[in-house]
Amino acid sequence: MSEQERIQDCLRKEIRSLLISTKDGLTPQQLEKEYLLMVGNHLPLRILGYRSTMELVLDMPDVVSVCPGGDGTVILKAIPDESTKGIASLVAKQRRSHKVRNSMPKGRPSICSGRVPYRGRVPPILPAVVKSELKDLLALSPVLLSDFEKAFARRFGRSFQYMQYGFLSMFEVLNAASDVISVEQTRAGSLLTLKKSVSEDKQRGWPAGKVFTQPFRMKQQGSYSTGFPVMKAHFSQPISNMEPPKQVLSMAKTPTFNSVEASRLNHTEKLNQLESTFKSVIAQIGPGGTVDPELKRKIQFVVSKFPQGLFISKLLGEFELTFKEQLSPKQLGFLNVTELVGALSDILRVEFSEERQDLLVFDADLKPLPSGGPLSSVRNSCLVQPDKKTEANPWTSSLSRNSLSTVAVKKTTWDCPLKNQKEPEQKIYKKPNLVVKPLQLQVETNKPQLSLSVANHDIPPDAVRAKKLCRLPPLDTSTLVGVFVEYIISPSQFYIRIYSRDSSELLEDMMIEMRRCYSNQLVSDRYIMPEYFIQPGHLCCVKISEDKWWYRVIIHRILGKKEVEVFYPDFGNIGTVQKSSLRFLKCCYTKLPAQAIPCSLAWVRPAEEHWTARAILHFQKLCGLKPLVGVVDEYIDGILNIFLCDTSSNEDVYFHHVLRTEGHAIVCRENAPSKGFRDFNPPALYTNASSAGDMVLTDLGHPAQQHYLNEDQEILQQAQQDINDGKCISYLKSAPKELLKDSKLSSLKTHKSCEEDPRWSILQPKDLKEENEDEVPTGMPCLESVTIGDDVWDENWLPLQAKMGKAGSPASQLFTSNLVGKKQYQTGGEMAQKDWCFSTSKDIWDDSWQPLGLANDVKGGIHTPEGPIAQEKNTSTTRIQQQPDLQYPLDSSTLPKLEEFYISLIKSQQSAERSQSEPASIQTHAGRAASKALSSTPAVGDSPENHSGSVESSPGSLKKEDVSNSRAEATAKDKSQGAIDQLSFILSPQHQISQKLYIPRSTATAVLGAAARLATSRSLLHWYPSVKGGKLEAERDGVK
């Protein structure tokens, strides 16, 4: 039983015992007091997740019975169980005390009692300041009730303490604010929104289609009933939608010119009385009725000091200067000063100035400026519209005799179309007549669309207006990433999206959040883009009706009145959408950089002048909808040149090889600028470069991989220093590139031809058999195939760093330690069936392992290794310094570098006996033994004294590793020929067994599998030739 269940079970017993001991029950307040006296602590409401005592007892129907009291209170009585029935019966038989009985009133209670019975606690009134804050919060967007506390704290910097206002729960607060807040039930929960004006109009009971607000001038003439004068008034409907609505009081019969003067006067008095009634009733029920009359007079006094009008933005400042006190609209319950002025339309009049593009406030008692003055009509989002005369009719002519020559009709609206129309205004006398189309200020106060901008459209404060997305930071050369090809124009012009935790997964999370946000109809309507914001280069979002998702888009060009062409910065494609589907993008959705990266396939150019349709179609089929392995080559004019490889099949597919084999492309060793992106590059036009410290793809920098890359740089720097200091072991000097134009290392001829090996043709790709050496550039990047066993790929494996030379000195290059699928030298013992793990122990360079020193034996300058291969337990990296002979200079770019190789570890599954003395048996069983092997040859530094011909003499040798012993013995047995054979078999990819490579989806993109060993244009992979034949062309073709 959990702690919470134990507390609840104990609480049920305590409450039952308290209520059983009371014959007449307890109220919730009495229960709290009794519990505090008995236990010494308050009821554990918060611990159990309850907000009030009533919620607690209602959740215990088997313990507490809620009964209504005679005076309207709630009485809680206990429901006894089997063990407490006897106690309950005894308590029920108890007599009431004499004192209590005497205090009870005798006889029937008096009907005319002067005491009002208690009907329960009356909920307090929500203060105007709190109501204003709630309106301010919900004006931005609706808020779920579960998120209300967080939203309020984020908006105002404090929590919403409703208890200090006298409320017991949030439910009472919402009831008190029901005039401005409505609660809607959605799937996500209760949604709090601002109430619409239409609902208020219906609640007031006005006729359909008519909206009544305060008139411009109201005189207090006593209190009037809100019933009969209002309901007797009938108004005619507007004649036309184009004309301003004119309200004319319709009467059963119009008085004729020959009517009696007394009758006419009586009728006029009735009309005046009706007019006053209208003004009084509307003023009393509107928001302006809550403003203190003394404050109204002060505001009117300030405005009256400016006959030419006071700008609404200066009203608060002038009020403070005049009366030395601040005027806060929020403390009065208004959202802003505009809402306050709108509520005081009985004493203030508002006009819009075309010259200053601002609102002017006038005293309603003052006459306006004559027509043609600096003031003109108020357009959309303003408070009033120009005056218009009503048509002459018998009723207005009769009213003109009663000191009114003209009926000034003030038409005001919030929903008028955008027009720069200027119409003459009519003079408003001190006592205006009926309002033809009433001012809709009180109706609109609850709408968040109040705006004083001249643009006359409500723009959400968090909407993106003139902001651009950032691009992803450039990737380092030789970085290995997982990519999706999103949009293809040609092999020289396509877009990729990096697959990682901090790129693709963040994009998915953002799209899910955008769908949740914009799917709300209220939010979607609020973020509609007006016509004048739809301009090329504007960042916004759009929903695709086919898949119901929202995407970030950038407007590229406007196609017509209804359609625009947009660019998708996260996917790279361009599409056509409707203008009506565009929405403002919230600022929080601009933090994620644009995910689409413009790319060009490295080292290829079209066979003809342009890419053919068949070449593009074939490239699209290669990419498909699957993750690919990509290695960064370089950036040219901001375009990423990248190699692509598909590792999902049994054999790795290199896209540049396939395009060249099909005759669609020519492989070259240089990257040419993309012509397509040079003509049109949307990311360069519409996005900004990422900042220096903005590293988004942190998934490429997992602690393991980032540590690995950092140590790579340190090792390379230290290795370069060792080269300069002469500490390294016989480095090769770089040869000029002219010596490598033929790309044939004819000097390194071997004794046996690889073509004679029957397994050579089997393992060699068919499409690469007939390729000529001249057609394949030197050092083409390749991805080594790896046999996958039954072990589980460990995502936390990380490459280790190489050490060479003396203890603690770094190795400049790391040997390819993946021996999977290659021929192995083994003894007659079985391969160890155990898991190997990476070790961070420092490995010392063994001078006896020098593969290119062995190669010198071919040319006669034999350089014999000085001892066996030393090994260390629980290490998985082989430290090798590859050094060609100085007699055969090579290009330094063909030497493998540290970051070209990734190390994999595969368990051995099958046992095979190998003969130590017969190399032929080694070759025979090599294919079978290559399926499962150790992924690396651990190297341990030996002192010069320990260099002997047997592996047992090595202090770092393994005790129970037959594979390592056999390899060491074979190397020590035949240092010249056997070591060369071993090296050639290790480095020869023709003797691999290509099996399917599985890439776990959750694995970091920098570790995309055991076969993730690619060379790049700056770090070319160079396979050293074997001694199996005199021709190297077939071997190099197999590598390619």
Curated annotation (Swiss-Prot):
**Phosphoserine found at:** S809, S943
The record's Gene3D superfamilies line, in alphabetical order, gives:
2.30.30.140, 2.40.50.90, LOTUS domain-like
Matching entries from CDD domains are given as: LOTUS_1_TDRD5, LOTUS_2_TDRD5, LOTUS_3_TDRD5, Tudor_TDRD5
Region (Disordered) location = 857-891, 912-975
Q: Where is the composition biased (Polar residues)?
A: 872-891, 912-924, 946-956
The alphabetical list of record keywords is: Cytoplasm, Developmental protein, Differentiation, Phosphoprotein, Repeat, Spermatogenesis
**Effect of gene disruption?**
Male sterility because of spermiogenic arrest at the round spermatid stage, with occasional failure in meiotic prophase. Effects are due to demethylation and subsequent derepression of transposable elements: germ cells fail to repress LINE-1 (L1) retrotransposons with DNA-demethylated promoters. Defects in chromatoid body (CB) and pi-body assembly are also observed. Interestingly, Tdrd5-deficient round spermatids injected into oocytes contribute to fertile offspring, showing that acquisition of a functional haploid genome may be uncoupled from Tdrd5 function.
Mind listing the GO biological process terms from this record? P granule organization; spermatid development; transposable element silencing by piRNA-mediated DNA methylation
Compartments it resides in: Cytoplasm
The role this protein plays is: Required during spermiogenesis to participate in the repression transposable elements and prevent their mobilization, which is essential for the germline integrity. Probably acts via the piRNA metabolic process, which mediates the repression of transposable elements during meiosis by forming complexes composed of piRNAs and Piwi proteins and govern the methylation and subsequent repression of transposons. Required for chromatoid body (CB) assembly.
This protein's name: Tudor domain-containing protein 5
Q: Which organism is it from?
A: Mus musculus (Mouse)
Q: What lineage is on file? A: Eukaryota, Metazoa, Chordata, Craniata, Vertebrata
**Gene for this protein?**
Tdrd5
